[in-house]
């Protein structure tokens, strides 16, 4: 049996990088419609893309295998989420995606000590990048909330980004622990100029 061929338009779109169709300040969505590049939808798509790239940067670091596998799975989910956002009315991220993240939070957090104070983002380079990814995830979530004020957004998509920032926090702690680094607790008495 021969493999199914991509529709000609899709194959052409993916092989041709410079199209000039966006030079007028609009961009094409997956359903063929065009929207302004400064629309809330495009902002959300860009924020999710930036988050995926930030996780890719984190994956360039030496990480424990379970962490790397988890992050790679998340990158696939984020690509699906970008697809969902690029086709109005399409749903790709489901409750099952959210549950998977919640399970991962529980699994990785089980090996960590309980926190009684806030921690400072940092530690190893990999843990620091996980904290950067966490903040980018929060920004992507805010972009989705802004978009939801004017057009439908899947409920699971918003919950996914919220849980993802929680997981990235836990993964930062996990990576530090694997490297033998302690969490640095925030201390109020250390605030202010010295």
Descriptions of predicted regions:
Residues 2-194:
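Phosphate/pyrophosphate-binding loop motifs in nucleotide- or prenyl diphosphate-using proteins
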């Amino acid at each position: 049996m021969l493999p199914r061929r991509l529709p000609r338009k899709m194959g052409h779109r993916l092989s041709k990088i410079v199209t000039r169709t966006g030079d007028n300040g609009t961009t094409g969505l997956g359903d063929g419609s065009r929207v302004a590049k400064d629309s809330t939808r495009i902002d959300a798509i860009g924020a999710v893309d930036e988050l995926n790239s930030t996780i890719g940067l984190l994956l360039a670091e030496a990480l424990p295998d379970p962490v790397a596998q988890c992050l790679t799975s998340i990158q696939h989910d984020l690509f699906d989420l970008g697809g969902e956002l690029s086709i109005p009315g399409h749903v790709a991220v489901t409750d099952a995606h959210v549950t998977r993240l919640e399970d991962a939070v529980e699994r990785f957090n089980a090996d960590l000590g309980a926190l009684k104070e806030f921690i400072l983002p940092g530690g190893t380079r990999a843990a620091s990048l996980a904290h950067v990814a966490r903040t980018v995830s929060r920004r992507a979530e805010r972009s989705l909330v802004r978009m939801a004020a004017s057009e439908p957004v899947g409920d699971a998509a918003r919950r996914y980004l919220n849980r993802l920032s929680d997981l990235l926090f836990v993964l930062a702690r996990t990576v530090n622990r694997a490297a033998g680094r302690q969490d640095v607790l925030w201390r109020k008495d250390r605030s202010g100029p010295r």
